[in-house]
Amino acid sequence: MTPQQYVQQKAVASGSSFYYAFLFLPAPRRAAITAFYAFCREVDDVVDEVSDPGVARTKLAWWQAEVTKAYAGQPTHPVMLALMPLATDYGIEQRHLQAVIDGCQMDLEQTRYLDFAGLQGYCHLVAGVVGEVAARIFGQTDPRTTEYAHRLGLAFQLTNIIRDVGEDAMPVSYTHLTLPTTPYV
């Protein structure tokens, strides 16, 4: 299986409607967003699918090292092998990938946010940065567009959190997030 086939399979297997939207993009942009999306899925799946927090931390540390190696020209994982040839063309920087990993790390360290500022910081890492990268891949360079894409990412993440409140309120050993207790101003 080639790296491109791997990221394609990862995107399809996620069941997300985003994948089908990607199909309308020109092939080079579609390849870039699919590889980036596969990266996000891989990292997020660590938190969602690994029940032992110690193992999850180890896997996220591995991804941090893989990103560092990839930007040094030595990627090994199929996702990074697919993404790196496109990263320069679309302005996908190491800090973007690191932010996504940092956000997933927050999932392991903090399960509740008591104010909107804390929740917004988390959403910035796991979704705002994703919006910014998507805007770059889609060819947008205007800083205002990047800011709007960032805010759209935040809105998507907040919507996901609200959607999952019932599920997260169920008595389990891990509660993903709760809504903040102070109003947003």
What is each model feature region?
Residues 1-177:
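Acidic catalytic motifs of isoprenoid enzymes
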Residues 176-185:
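Single conserved hydrophobic/aromatic residue that forms the stacking wall/gate
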